[in-house]
Amino acid sequence: MRRLYLFVLILATFLTTSHGIVDASQDFQHLRRGLQEEAGEDEERIKLSGFKLPKSFGKRFKQKLSTKTKAFATRAASRMFQKKKGPLYGKYYKNAGKPKRQTPQIAATGPAKPKVQSPEEAAAVPGPYGQSLEYRVAQKVPLREREAFNPAKLSKINEMIPV
Protein backbone atom coordinates (compact mmCIF):
# COMPACT_ATOMS: atom_id res chain seq x y z
CA MET A 1 0.00 0.00 0.00
CA ARG A 2 2.89 2.34 0.83
CA ARG A 3 4.50 1.75 -2.54
CA LEU A 4 1.23 2.59 -4.25
CA TYR A 5 0.90 5.74 -2.18
CA LEU A 6 4.48 6.77 -3.08
CA PHE A 7 3.77 6.09 -6.74
CA VAL A 8 0.72 8.34 -6.61
CA LEU A 9 2.78 11.04 -4.86
CA ILE A 10 5.46 10.89 -7.55
CA LEU A 11 2.75 10.99 -10.18
CA ALA A 12 1.26 14.05 -8.49
CA THR A 13 4.62 15.85 -8.45
CA PHE A 14 5.06 15.04 -12.12
CA LEU A 15 1.62 16.46 -12.84
CA THR A 16 2.45 19.67 -10.92
CA THR A 17 5.40 20.36 -13.18
CA SER A 18 3.38 19.85 -16.36
CA HIS A 19 -0.15 21.13 -15.57
CA GLY A 20 0.12 23.47 -12.65
CA ILE A 21 -0.38 23.17 -8.91
CA VAL A 22 -4.20 23.47 -8.85
CA ASP A 23 -4.88 20.82 -11.49
CA ALA A 24 -2.36 18.44 -9.94
CA SER A 25 -3.86 18.71 -6.45
CA GLN A 26 -7.34 18.00 -7.82
CA ASP A 27 -6.05 15.02 -9.78
CA PHE A 28 -4.19 13.79 -6.72
CA GLN A 29 -7.28 14.04 -4.48
CA HIS A 30 -9.36 12.21 -7.08
CA LEU A 31 -6.79 9.43 -7.36
CA ARG A 32 -6.48 9.13 -3.59
CA ARG A 33 -10.27 8.87 -3.12
CA GLY A 34 -10.48 6.20 -5.83
CA LEU A 35 -7.69 4.17 -4.25
CA GLN A 36 -9.29 4.37 -0.80
CA GLU A 37 -12.64 3.22 -2.17
CA GLU A 38 -11.05 0.27 -3.95
CA ALA A 39 -9.12 -0.72 -0.82
CA GLY A 40 -12.28 -0.47 1.29
CA GLU A 41 -14.23 -2.66 -1.11
CA ASP A 42 -11.49 -5.29 -1.07
CA GLU A 43 -11.35 -5.31 2.74
CA GLU A 44 -15.13 -5.67 2.97
CA ARG A 45 -15.08 -8.52 0.47
CA ILE A 46 -12.35 -10.29 2.47
CA LYS A 47 -14.23 -9.79 5.75
CA LEU A 48 -17.45 -11.14 4.27
CA SER A 49 -15.70 -14.25 2.97
CA GLY A 50 -14.18 -14.93 6.41
CA PHE A 51 -10.67 -15.21 4.99
CA LYS A 52 -7.87 -13.82 7.15
CA LEU A 53 -4.40 -13.11 5.87
CA PRO A 54 -1.53 -14.28 8.09
CA LYS A 55 0.55 -11.63 9.86
CA SER A 56 3.70 -12.65 7.99
CA PHE A 57 1.98 -12.23 4.61
CA GLY A 58 3.77 -9.00 3.68
CA LYS A 59 7.14 -10.12 5.04
CA ARG A 60 7.28 -13.14 2.75
CA PHE A 61 7.15 -11.00 -0.35
CA LYS A 62 9.73 -8.54 0.94
CA GLN A 63 12.37 -11.23 1.32
CA LYS A 64 14.39 -11.52 -1.85
CA LEU A 65 16.74 -14.41 -2.49
CA SER A 66 20.12 -13.82 -4.03
CA THR A 67 21.16 -15.79 -7.10
CA LYS A 68 23.58 -17.84 -4.98
CA THR A 69 20.87 -19.07 -2.65
CA LYS A 70 18.57 -19.87 -5.57
CA ALA A 71 21.32 -21.89 -7.23
CA PHE A 72 22.02 -23.67 -3.94
CA ALA A 73 18.33 -24.52 -3.52
CA THR A 74 18.05 -25.99 -7.01
CA ARG A 75 21.23 -28.03 -6.50
CA ALA A 76 19.94 -29.34 -3.17
CA ALA A 77 16.63 -30.30 -4.77
CA SER A 78 18.35 -32.17 -7.60
CA ARG A 79 20.54 -33.99 -5.04
CA MET A 80 17.44 -35.06 -3.13
CA PHE A 81 15.99 -36.63 -6.26
CA GLN A 82 19.30 -38.34 -7.06
CA LYS A 83 19.46 -39.82 -3.56
CA LYS A 84 15.83 -40.96 -3.85
CA LYS A 85 14.78 -38.86 -0.89
CA GLY A 86 12.43 -36.01 -0.37
CA PRO A 87 8.68 -35.58 -0.41
CA LEU A 88 8.17 -35.76 -4.17
CA TYR A 89 10.41 -38.75 -4.89
CA GLY A 90 7.87 -41.44 -4.07
CA LYS A 91 5.07 -39.71 -5.89
CA TYR A 92 6.81 -39.36 -9.26
CA TYR A 93 9.90 -41.55 -9.43
CA LYS A 94 9.41 -44.63 -7.25
CA ASN A 95 6.63 -46.18 -9.33
CA ALA A 96 7.92 -45.01 -12.70
CA GLY A 97 8.86 -48.44 -14.10
CA LYS A 98 6.04 -50.43 -12.55
CA PRO A 99 2.82 -51.02 -14.46
CA LYS A 100 -0.34 -49.75 -12.83
CA ARG A 101 -2.56 -52.25 -11.07
CA GLN A 102 -5.31 -53.41 -13.35
CA THR A 103 -8.73 -54.33 -12.09
CA PRO A 104 -9.79 -57.83 -13.12
CA GLN A 105 -12.17 -57.82 -16.05
CA ILE A 106 -15.46 -59.53 -15.23
CA ALA A 107 -16.71 -61.53 -18.18
CA ALA A 108 -20.39 -61.03 -18.90
CA THR A 109 -20.98 -64.64 -19.98
CA GLY A 110 -23.74 -65.47 -17.53
CA PRO A 111 -24.05 -66.29 -13.84
CA ALA A 112 -20.96 -67.13 -11.81
CA LYS A 113 -20.15 -70.82 -11.29
CA PRO A 114 -21.15 -72.15 -7.85
CA LYS A 115 -18.35 -73.09 -5.45
CA VAL A 116 -17.60 -76.80 -5.33
CA GLN A 117 -17.98 -78.24 -1.84
CA SER A 118 -17.85 -82.03 -1.98
CA PRO A 119 -15.10 -84.16 -3.61
CA GLU A 120 -17.66 -85.72 -5.98
CA GLU A 121 -18.66 -82.34 -7.31
CA ALA A 122 -14.99 -81.38 -7.54
CA ALA A 123 -14.32 -84.40 -9.72
CA ALA A 124 -17.12 -83.37 -12.07
CA VAL A 125 -15.59 -79.92 -12.68
CA PRO A 126 -12.83 -79.95 -15.34
CA GLY A 127 -9.43 -78.63 -14.23
CA PRO A 128 -8.32 -75.25 -15.58
CA TYR A 129 -4.71 -76.27 -16.24
CA GLY A 130 -5.02 -80.01 -16.77
CA GLN A 131 -4.16 -80.92 -13.16
CA SER A 132 -4.73 -84.37 -11.75
CA LEU A 133 -8.05 -85.20 -10.15
CA GLU A 134 -6.48 -85.77 -6.72
CA TYR A 135 -4.77 -82.38 -6.83
CA ARG A 136 -7.99 -80.59 -7.72
CA VAL A 137 -9.92 -82.38 -5.00
CA ALA A 138 -7.20 -81.60 -2.45
CA GLN A 139 -7.43 -77.91 -3.31
CA LYS A 140 -11.18 -77.83 -2.66
CA VAL A 141 -11.20 -79.90 0.57
CA PRO A 142 -10.46 -78.28 3.97
CA LEU A 143 -7.00 -78.68 5.51
CA ARG A 144 -7.95 -81.47 7.99
CA GLU A 145 -9.31 -83.70 5.26
CA ARG A 146 -6.53 -83.03 2.73
CA GLU A 147 -4.32 -85.90 3.83
CA ALA A 148 -6.86 -88.43 2.60
CA PHE A 149 -6.68 -86.97 -0.91
CA ASN A 150 -2.88 -86.47 -1.00
CA PRO A 151 -1.69 -88.15 -4.25
CA ALA A 152 1.54 -89.42 -2.63
CA LYS A 153 -0.33 -91.03 0.26
CA LEU A 154 -2.95 -92.47 -2.09
CA SER A 155 -0.25 -94.22 -4.10
CA LYS A 156 1.27 -95.66 -0.87
CA ILE A 157 -2.15 -96.90 0.23
CA ASN A 158 -2.72 -98.47 -3.17
CA GLU A 159 0.65 -100.28 -2.86
CA MET A 160 -0.31 -101.66 0.56
CA ILE A 161 -3.59 -103.12 -0.69
CA PRO A 162 -2.99 -106.69 -1.88
CA VAL A 163 -4.24 -107.47 -5.33
Swiss-Prot record:
Cell location: Secreted; Host nucleus; Host cytoplasm
Main location: secreted
Signal sequence, renumbered to the chain: 1-20
The keyword Signal belongs to this UniProt entry's keyword annotation: yes
GO annotations of cellular component type: extracellular region; host cell cytoplasm; host cell nucleus
Region (Disordered): 94-127
Keywords carried by this UniProt record: Host cytoplasm, Host nucleus, Secreted, Signal, Virulence
Source taxon at top rank: Eukaryota
Entry protein name: Secreted RxLR effector protein 135
Encoding gene (name): RXLR135
